[in-house]
């Protein structure tokens, strides 16, 4: 639940309830999570129908639930590309895949097999600038962005849809790193480590996706 800068861990389980451990060494291995809408700062209403690509993948593959029927995807990472194909095969209409960068974040074969083979358009250097709908998504507006990442006026395009999937990368789970006082890399948001994967605090190490 918490780690102090003196390496005192506050934890909890069903058997013992809440307890503390004074550690000599700690390994941070909390992993990462998908970027949410909040992390992307997309303006507009907050209706139902906005999912991370990983959540949508779980709903379809494991729970047999279709998130929606008319879909716009933001981000062209491999999970987003694969979900574009999967949603299409399940009967949904994927209107467009918008990618902020001037290149796709996914493998070339996934672009061909998941988008080109199903005539799904990929718009590079584009992002979602507005979400419409109160109870449920009714549409999104995308626009081209310049080299500074800002939307270019006059390039707006509106797509009616009931679902927006976000495939915009992963960010480290850094709350415990932050509470421990570990120095974070401003680029990756993960801990800064040396060659031994030791953080700025002696005896506190980090590994895996919590780093980047």
Residue locations for each model-derived region?
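Residues forming the flavin
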Residues: 1-212
């Amino acid at each position: 639940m918490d780690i102090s800068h003196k390496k005192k861990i506050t934890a909890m389980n069903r058997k013992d309830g809440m307890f503390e451990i004074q550690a000599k060494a700690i390994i941070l291995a909390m992993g990462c999570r998908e970027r949410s809408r909040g992390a992307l700062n997309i303006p507009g209403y907050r209706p139902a129908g906005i999912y991370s690509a990983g959540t949508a993948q779980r709903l379809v593959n494991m729970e047999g639930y279709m998130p929606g029927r008319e879909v716009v995807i933001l981000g062209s990472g491999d999970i987003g590309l694969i979900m574009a194909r999967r949603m299409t095969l399940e009967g949904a209409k994927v209107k467009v895949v918008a990618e902020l960068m001037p290149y796709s974040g996914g493998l070339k074969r996934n672009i061909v097999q998941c988008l080109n083979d199903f005539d799904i358009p990929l718009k590079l250097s584009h992002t979602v600038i507005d979400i419409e709908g109160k109870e449920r998504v009714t549409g999104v507006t995308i626009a081209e962005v310049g080299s500074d990442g800002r939307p270019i006026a006059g390039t707006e395009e509106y797509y009616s849809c009931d679902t927006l999937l976000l495939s915009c990368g992963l960010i480290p789970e850094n709350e415990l790193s932050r509470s421990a006082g570990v120095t974070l890399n401003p680029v990756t948001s993960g801990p800064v480590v040396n060659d031994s994967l030791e953080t700025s605090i002696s005896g506190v190490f980090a590994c895996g996706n919590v780093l980047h």
